Amino acid sequence: MLYPTEFDVIVVGGGHAGTEAALASARMGAKTLLLTHNIETLGQMSCNPSIGGIGKGHLVKEVDALGGAMAAATDEAGIQFRILNSSKGPAVRATRAQADRILYKAAIRRRLENQPNLWLFQQAVDDLMVEGDCVVGAVTQIGIRFRARAVVLTAGTFLDGKIHVGLNNYTGGRAGDPAAVSLSARLKELKLPQGRLKTGTPPRIDGRTIDFSKLEEQPGDLDPIPVFSFLGRAEQHPQQLPCWVTHTNERTHDIIRGGLDRSPMYTGVIEGVGPRYCPSIEDKIHRFASKESHQIFLEPEGLTTNEFYPNGISTSLPFDVQLELVHSMRGLEQAHILRPGYAIEYDYFDPRALKASLETKAINGLFFAGQINGTTGYEEAAAQGLLAGVNAGRYVQEKDAWCPRRDQAYLGVLVDDLVTRGVAEPYRMFTSRAEYRLSLREDNADMRLTEIGRELGLVDDVRWDAFCRKRDAVSRETERLKTTWVTPKTLPPEEATALLGKPIDHEYSLAELLRRPGVDYDGVCGLKGGECGPAEPLADDPVLLAQIKEQVEIGIKYQGYIERQATEIERNDANENTRLPDGIDYREVRGLSFEVSQKLNQFRPETIGQASRISGVTPAAISLLMVHLKRRGLGRRNGAAAPAAEQGDGAVPTQQ
């Protein structure tokens, strides 16, 4: 039957990508339908019970700055919070949280059920409705046809998923859930380029059978307890719990080696490529044969369960081998396994067949987000989901897509890497992937993106008001520190010595003092008995106050580096966003090698910047391409055709 209501946007899948996509398009005013095979699993953490980490935490902060749900849900569900790399520079500091699975899922579902313009429906999707080169809806397992002008597909590991435990395997999207076999077959009919990838998960352990007296305790940060959302408060966190650490040993490694003849990875049963940066335990033992031990983190799954997640022993070995290797580790000698570990193979589609908006090049109105694009991780999925939801909403509103740049957001780095370079293995985010990471810090994600989010319709009044207060306070306080001066006469020598190691010998601004190594904001403001501090409190709220002080201190201390990076960005921007015509035939570009013209015709980059990052496309080739465009007057700056109503102060960067 044809469902009587027509929607603007349909989102297929209720994982981390799907939920953010549905919430984003609905916040923008698009009439949105979220189709999921099971409403009870919306927002489910299918693998590890944690959010964030190096690079990943940056993505979560960006999703939050754009009004997304992941950070806020983590603040409500997080049972341990830590700042990683806290002793290093601000560019690589990252927030990570252990989350209670049940509380997290409940927090996400509550937001979905209370979001205006969003409807939920429980049915697996078997088919897409395509007319010509446009998607027009989706068909469910029982034949219900839903019409919409845009569809966002976030199928996770469900597309033709196959689960492996030893040499036994069966179809499934994850343990306990069916695979999307029909939908996968339909996508293959559409001639979209695809491949197979693999990921895995460890056996889960009953905490009542763990001997914690033999383990090393790993508490979270308690003074202060971090928060994830820019609007988060530590008071939102539930009870905090420690993690625990054990190690593999030589006996563990011998057990694993002895089971490799029954490993689906090492017997050729699994064809998909696994994640390099989250390898299975058998892969670790094989690749790092000289290493005598590997650290294993025992992470609590929640406050109302005894289940523990042993982070570091993802495996698809037979269950008898899993049992033996778990029992070989200190503290786990009597451990009871609640669920076996397994590997899952699934279809993904080459992201080079996508535009930077995450819309497919072949089918108008069809967007992909999450693991279907070859990524791994909740955070990467959520970020893509939000972007796909935004651009699906703008597509039906007949507005240009929003495509964040590499110098603007980790989300821009993520998508640009995917659509220009593709993936040979599951892609995960690291700070090292961002060439402008000093400007793309966790602490300034809101400064970079919240104004854009407001313009897009993603940011509500509460977030906007908090952001404006923070932005204005940072600006005022930075200016005050730059224009407040102390001299050898006005600054007592003993105070200068206590803070700086010696008295000052000439006039300094407070900002100049703050730039010195080992000097912090509070130290500078405490000079002259506190007279060097602001006349009025920067904020009444302690969390907001801490954010303001952090922004001011980083902005002043790293001003020179940040300005140099801004100059580099401006220099590179000259050609980065020059658009390439849709119908250009690169064989006609004089001087291009056959290999380069073939690659450009195959991958169809949208901008000069994207073309320059395709493997094998040299700087010389880019120069030839620029000459070709100038001769024919074909190139135009990104966003040049944006409607006049969308230009001006705070205008959203656009891309067709």
UniProtKB/Swiss-Prot annotation:
Q: Where in the cell is it found?
A: Cytoplasm
Keywords for the protein's UniProt record, in alphabetical order: Cytoplasm, FAD, Flavoprotein, NAD, tRNA processing
Q: Which residues bind FAD?
A: 13-18
Q: Which GO terms describe its cellular component?
A: cytosol
In terms of Pfam families, this protein maps to:
GIDA, GIDA_C_1st, SAM_GIDA_C
Q: Which domain of life is it from?
A: Bacteria
List the Gene Ontology MF annotations in alphabetical order: flavin adenine dinucleotide binding
Q: Which NCBIfam families match?
A: mnmG_gidA
Assembly with partners or alone = Homodimer. Heterotetramer of two MnmE and two MnmG subunits.
According to its UniProt record, which protein family does this protein belong to?
Belongs to the MnmG family.
Give the protein name, as stated in the record: tRNA uridine 5-carboxymethylaminomethyl modification enzyme MnmG
